[in-house]
Amino acid sequence: MSDLLTDELGQAFQITDEDKGCRIKGQQCILANIGVVRSIATFLSTSLGPTGMDKILQSKDEDIVVTNDGATILKEMEMTENPISRLIVQLSESQDEEIGDGTTSVVVLASALLDQAQALLGQGVHPIKISEGFEVGLGHAVEHLSEISEEISDLKETMMKAAKTSLGSKIVYKSLERFAEICTDAVLMVADMERKDLDFELINIESKVGRDLSSTALIKGIVINKEFSHPQMKKEVKDGRIALLSCPFEPPKLKTKHSLVISNPKEYKELEEYEKKKFAEMIESIKRSGSNIVMCQWGFDDEANSLLMENGLPAVRWVGGHELELLAVHTGGSIVARFEDLEESDLGKARVREESLGTENDKIIVVENEGCSKAVTILVRGANDLVIEEAKRSIRDALCAVRNILTNSRIVYGGGSSEMSCSLALERIATGYSGEEREAILGFGRALEEIPLCLARNSGHDPIGYSSDLRKLQMESKNFHLGVDCLGDGEQDMKKLGVFDALSSKIRQFQMATQLVTMVLKIDNVVSDFHD
C-alpha cells in the first residue's frame, strides 16, 4: 500500500491502481479524516465572531458570493470529492435548519475535539474509548450549561439582544439596532405565543436593489414583486375585497390534444365572439362576488386586461403560488380554482397599493391588513445583489436566534464565556475519573477552549496569552459571564454587554460537534472510485 499524501488543502489521497480504486484503512484512515476536518475548520475559523472576516466564493458558473456565514460557505464551496467533506456539509445544513446559527462554532469545536483525539490516539488509546470519554464529557458539559443558564425576564428585550448578538458579525452591523428591532417585531407579530412556536413561512423576505441597508423596512402584510397589469388601473384600493384565483383568465380549453380549423371569416368572428362572451362571464363572476381587486396565479392577454380595466377591477397577474397562499392567510380569503365557484365568503380583506421604488421606477404591490396581521414581509434594500443576499442571510440567522429565545426561555452567555466555564468545570469533574476516560474528559474540556481562543485571535489579541488570562480570571472571580473582549472596549462581562445564546442552541452546538467526532473516529476504511 502506498504512503498517505495530502493535497494543497490538506486532504488525504493515495495513488493506487485505477482498477482497484483508492482505499485508506486503519488508524491512517482516521488521521486522514482528521486532517480533512482540520483544513475546513482552519478555513472557517477566521469568520467566527463579530470581528470575523468575510469570504468571497466564486462558483463554476462564475456567480460570486460574499459572506461570513459558515453554512453558506460550506454549501458554496461544493466539496464533493471527499466523503468527510460532504458529511460536514450535511451536518452544517442540519444545524442551519434546526438552530439557524452556530455552524462555524460546530466545525471549529469538532476540529479541536479531533486534535485532542489525535493526541490520545498517539498515546495508544482506542478510538472507541475516546468516543465514549467524549460522550461523558459532553454529558457533564450540558449539565453545567444548564446550571449556569438563566431564565429571561423581559421577552422582547431578550429577543432584541439575541438578534443583536447574531447580527453583530454580519454585514448589517452598522444598522444593528434597526435590524434587531425588525427581526424581533416580525417574530412577535406572527408567533403562536401559546404554543411558543413560529412558522417561518409567515415571514416573507423580499428585496429591491436601491438605497442602502438602513432603508430596509418591516411591512405588516405581504409584498409582491409585481405591478398592476394595466398602467391606468387604480394605484390604491383602501377597502380591498380580494379575489384569489388559481385558474387562468382565459376561455376553457379541451384537456385532450386537439386542433381548431377556421376556414372562413365568419367562423373566425364566431370564435372571437365566443372568447368575448367567456371573458364577460368571468368578469361578471368576479363582480357578482363583490370583489374589487383580483390576484391571479396565471397570466391573461390584452383583451382580458382591457376588460378588467374597463370594469374598474385592478388586477395583478403571475402571482406566485407561495405568495397566493400567504395572501390567503393574511387577508382571510380562500384560493378559488374556478370562476363559477367564487363567492363573497372567499374574498380576502385588505388595503392594496402599488409603490414605486428607486430611480428606475421599480414597482411592488403592498397588501396590508392592519386589523389582523397574520403574515409580515421584510423588504430588504441595498446597493447591489451581493449586499442584499448577504443581508437576507443575516436576517434569517437573526430570526432563528429570536425564535430560539421564544421556544426556550433559558440563555447562556457568549463571547466564549460558556465554553471556558465548561472547560473549568470538566477539569474539576475529571478528578473523579481515572485512566483513559479521565484523559478523554480533560481533552473535551481543552477542546472547548478553542472557541475563546479563536475569538481572541480574530479580535487581534494574543490568542494564547488572552485565553490563559481569561481562564485565570474566571477561576479567581468565579464569574462565568467573563468572555473575550471582541470589540476592544475593555469590557469582558458578557452579561453587561448583552451577548448570549439560547441554551438550546449552545447545547445543540456541543452535541453536533461531538456527533461528528464520533462518526470520524469510528470510520476505519474509506474506499472511493472502486471498480469490481
From Swiss-Prot:
Entries under SUPFAM superfamilies matching the protein: GroEL apical domain-like, GroEL equatorial domain-like, GroEL-intermediate domain like
Assembly and interaction partners: Component of the T-complex protein 1 (TCP1) complex.
GO cellular component terms given for this protein: chaperonin-containing T-complex
Keywords: ATP-binding, Chaperone, Cytoplasm, Nucleotide-binding
Subcellular compartments: Cytoplasm
Main location (coarse class): cytoplasm
Organism placement in taxonomy: Eukaryota, Fungi, Fungi incertae sedis, Microsporidia, Unikaryonidae
The protein's name in its UniProt record: T-complex protein 1 subunit epsilon
Source species: Encephalitozoon cuniculi (strain GB-M1) (Microsporidian parasite)
GO function terms (MF aspect): ATP binding; ATP hydrolysis activity; ATP-dependent protein folding chaperone; unfolded protein binding
